[in-house]
Amino acid sequence: MTAQSIDNILSSSEKNVKQWYVVHTASGAEKRIKEDMLRKIAKQNMTHFFEDILIPVFGVSEVKRGKNVKVEKKLMPSYILIKMNMTDKSWHLVKNISGVTGFLGSKTTPKALTESEIQNIFNNLEAEAKEAKNSKLYEVGEIVTVTDGPFETFMGTVEEIDQEKNRLKVSVAIFGKATPIELNFNQVKKND
């Protein structure tokens, strides 16, 4: 950081204002880097500069070797979010951790995220987690009940699942004849 950029940042940092920053890391090293940061922060007695360090992940169920396993997917691979008080000392601590390639922003002036940007990240994380949960809720051949629309309370069998559009093709009996209808995931529920 240059003296001028540090001075600009210090004007808000001296008030002990913690803001969210994005740190770029080596690919696949996010967890190790977070652990290294936490160790160095504690070792250098700088916990008062840092409020939170997050790796934006969400859990999904995947089938591996015939078994359903829960795995973590990264919303922003190679990035870590840090809520910190940006000072020359805290900047150097983060920047000098092995695997950190830099802060989002210019080379000398890290750019803090706005409230709307950080809210957008958290909303995306929540949406991804919800979508991942919904995408594994239904299986072909499963019996479901329609909960919304003109076929509400009808029972049917899942014929197709469109993960991309969060839609199902469900076969319901209308006048004694199996009729396929397309529904959103949130328009059906599993039968117990």
Swiss-Prot record:
Pfam families found in the cross-reference section: KOW (PF00467), NusG (PF02357)
Q: What Gene3D superfamilies does the database record attribute to this sequence? A: 2.30.30.30, NusG, N-terminal domain
Q: PROSITE patterns annotated for this entry?
A: NUSG
KW Lyase (keyword) present: no
A Gene Ontology BP annotation from the UniProt entry: regulation of DNA-templated transcription elongation
Which GO cellular component terms are attached?
A: cytosol
Stored PANTHER family: RHO-INTERACTING TRANSCRIPTION TERMINATION FACTOR NUSG, TRANSCRIPTION TERMINATION_ANTITERMINATION PROTEIN NUSG
Function statement:
Participates in transcription elongation, termination and antitermination.
Q: Family assignment?
A: Belongs to the NusG family.
Q: Which named protein is this?
A: Transcription termination/antitermination protein NusG
Q: What is the lineage of its organism?
A: Bacteria, Pseudomonadati, Pseudomonadota, Alphaproteobacteria, Rickettsiales
